[in-house]
């Protein structure tokens, strides 16, 4: 059954999987589906072994007997989307038009720490509506609408992704609109849904812009992806150009959705490999370049180097990424911001323990993000999946800064609908 499923996935007209923003089946969806299949097949084998001789057994495969999982795969494939999870999508049909598929995600969490001045709080996570529409065999639409609250308890609505997609073949696919920049691995493998990821939150270096993140997580422009031909290494390329991140004042909206603050454009180039002989393994590198123009500082040349090595197979998750931001101030100095994280987890039935160590060090004299300074520490926790639709997570963390150290816990219920 798994061989048939994998063949169907590979036969679909996409230009790669989750690492290619907005194209094809989401890589995390496939891993979750295959993991669930393995678990169900194991349960069926145990039941067959325990059944008395002569007792009839059901011949259908466990994947086919699980309508939630099989429906998710069918819905995702027909929509040409990249972030559907292992649950049914909701179809909205209008006579004469292609059906629109809607998938929902959200979470509720609680956090407490011993940091002075920090208050333990319950909090609403992002309410995420993932929308896809297939216009033809080669054309599709993808939207991601998020409702969330900020630190001032104000609820707002933001269009996190909006893409018009053209897929010529496995070697070329082009998206136009607002996308998740393909810097490293995590940003295009895990989108706006905590349910998809093992831990409660994202790694420190991949925090969203409105949450204090230093990377240009979102961009508005063009993104091209595809597979390189004649390669047993499973090589894929990424080429993106967009407005880049706003930099004039800290109060500006970080994502330049409508107007660019200058005529220069941000460019991101990347390449990654998924060797055929090592299922679940991926390694890659990307280079991002932009010019920033903060008031009172002058032009800053920004270069972001990112590399990753990940392995996800048979319930094992091993993620490793290193990133260096280089800021060259015109007529001034050059500053480097190193950051990395390493995360490992292992699924054992419905339980997945995980551990992550993360690090970021912003120089004291760095002109843009010196308020962040040095931050590093471990995060360890446990994820328990109630079923294919809901999960509970409990994690403990230690946050170490230059002059402050704190300990705390986070707990979360995340779900898809």
Task: Give the location of each predicted region.
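Active-site-proximal beta-alpha loop/turn segments in soluble metabolic enzymes
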Residues: 240, 244-258, 288-294
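Sec-dependent N-terminal signal peptides
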Residues: 4-13
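Outer membrane beta-barrel
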Residues: 89-247, 263-268, 272-278, 343-354, ...
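Outer-membrane beta-barrel pore domains
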Residues: 116, 154, 162-167, 175-178, ...
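N-terminal periplasmic/intermembrane-space "pro-region" immediately following the signal or transit peptide
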Residues: 18-110, 417
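Interfacial loop-to-helix transition and helix-capping segments at the boundaries
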Residues: 256-264, 300
């Amino acid at each position: 059954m798994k061989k048939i499923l994998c063949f169907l996935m590979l036969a679909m007209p996409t230009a790669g999987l989750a690492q290619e923003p907005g194209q094809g089946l989401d890589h995390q969806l496939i891993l979750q589906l295959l993991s669930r299949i393995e678990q169900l097949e194991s349960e069926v084998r145990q039941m067959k072994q325990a059944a008395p001789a002569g007792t009839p057994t059901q011949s259908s495969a466990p994947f086919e007997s699980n309508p939630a999982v099989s429906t998710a795969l069918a819905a995702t494939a027909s929509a040409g989307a990249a972030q559907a999870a292992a649950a049914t999508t909701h179809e909205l049909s209008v006579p004469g038009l292609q059906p629109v598929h809607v998938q929902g995600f959200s979470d509720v969490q609680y956090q407490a720490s011993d940091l002075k001045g920090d208050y333990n709080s319950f909090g609403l996570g992002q309410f995420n509506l993932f929308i896809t529409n297939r216009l033809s065999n080669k054309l599709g639409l993808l939207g991601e609408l998020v409702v969330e609250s900020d630190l001032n308890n104000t609820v707002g609505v933001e269009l996190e992704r909006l893409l018009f997609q053209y897929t010529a073949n496995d070697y070329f696919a082009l998206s136009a609109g607002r996308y998740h920049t393909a810097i490293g691995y995590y940003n295009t493998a895990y989108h706006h849904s905590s349910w998809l990821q093992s831990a409660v939150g994202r790694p420190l270096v991949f925090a969203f812009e409105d949450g204090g993140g230093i990377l240009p997580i979102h961009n508005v422009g063009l993104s091209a992806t595809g597979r390189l031909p004649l390669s047993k290494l499973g090589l894929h390329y990424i080429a993106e150009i967009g407005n880049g991140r706003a930099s004039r004042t800290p109060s500006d909206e970080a994502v330049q959705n409508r107007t660019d603050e200058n005529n220069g454009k941000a460019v991101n180039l990347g390449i990654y490999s998924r060797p055929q002989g090592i299922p679940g393994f991926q390694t890659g590198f990307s280079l991002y370049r932009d010019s920033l123009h903060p008031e009172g500082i002058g032009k800053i040349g920004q270069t972001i180097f990112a590399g990753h090595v990940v392995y996800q197979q048979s319930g094992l998750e091993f993620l490793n990424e290193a990133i260096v931001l280089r800021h060259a101030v015109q007529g001034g100095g050059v500053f480097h911001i190193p950051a990395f994280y390493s995360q490992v987890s292992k699924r054992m039935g419905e339980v997945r323990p995980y551990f992550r160590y993360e690090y970021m060090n912003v120089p004291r004299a760095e002109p843009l993000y010196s308020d962040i300074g040095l931050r590093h520490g471990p995060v360890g926790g446990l994820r328990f999946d109630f079923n294919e639709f809901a999960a509970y997570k409990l994690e403990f963390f230690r946050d170490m800064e230059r002059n402050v150290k704190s300990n705390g816990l986070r707990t979360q219920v995340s779900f898809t609908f």
